Amino acid sequence: MIEQFHLGRDADCPWEADKDDPGVRWRQLVSGDRTPSCGITQGVCEVAPGSELAPHHHAPQEVYYAIEGRAEIYRHGAWHPIEKGDMAYIPGGTTHGLRNRGSEPFVLVWTFPTDTFAEIEYVDG
């Protein structure tokens, strides 16, 4: 993929979901198979109240940046609070997850150092 300036819109990035994590959905904002980019993949994830992104791991490192709401992030065998304005750096191979026990959606921006989102193989934690 050739790198070039790209300006995207929410309307161009449909919500996606996985039956294994009901109440969790995401948008791929930057991914080399959808945008003229390489070396970075980024999107937005929303965890509905009462929902959970089950603990999992994957080879690439990842960064979360919380932009709305409150939730709990799983790391080092325990759940810890995460809220709007918090950032989490997740080393590759580290088991992590999210759960929202609140009454409002929890929304974060995620980033991987990969060309495409399809390169990331999620493994149950």
Segments (PLM) and residue ranges:
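Short, conserved beta-strand element in jelly-roll/cupin
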Residues: V44-A48, H57-I73, T111
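A short, N-terminal "cap"/entry segment at the start of jelly-roll beta-barrel domains
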Residues: M1-G39, I120-G125
